[in-house]
Amino acid sequence: LYAASLRLPFLPTRAGLGSDVMTLQPWLRTVRSPYADEEELLAVPAIELDLAIVHMNRADAKGNAQFLGPDFFFDDLFLGAAKRRFVSCEKLVPTEELTREGSFHTLRIHRGMVDGVVETPRGAHFTECPPDYGRDEAFQSEYANAARDAEAWSSFEGRYLALESEAEYQRAVAARAAGGAR
């Protein structure tokens, strides 16, 4: 992802040399450093993406976005590596509000990296978006179990995915969490 975000065909690394990486991935290549040491390095190819959608805590309408949790998860690299880039966010705010909560270090996404923004509360469900909400482990377990069986998947899809709107999905998830059906 980093190579693609820099628009490079590959990045050299020492990681993997002296291991079975080259044996297990025979399509990988090595390159020699053009400098005096002429060190042999592994050339890891860029992972170019057609589309990236990342979810952030807050964003403005221009595409400047902020994460408030403890880990940034490579979201900037996904956007940098993609041809089309979108941010969904818990809350759409005026630009000046982005500096009112969290340090400037939390503003890792800027408008030049983004093609569009959409406000989508709870848009990272079933994963987390701290401090707004944590992982929904029970829902993730239901999802993983359903994915193992075609009939179970069809039922899961009908309950959660084949709905008319995001609002219906959120109601179904809330009903499930409350122990009821939608």
Q: Which residues fall in each region the model found?
A:
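Conserved alpha/beta enzyme-core scaffold
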Residues: 1-182
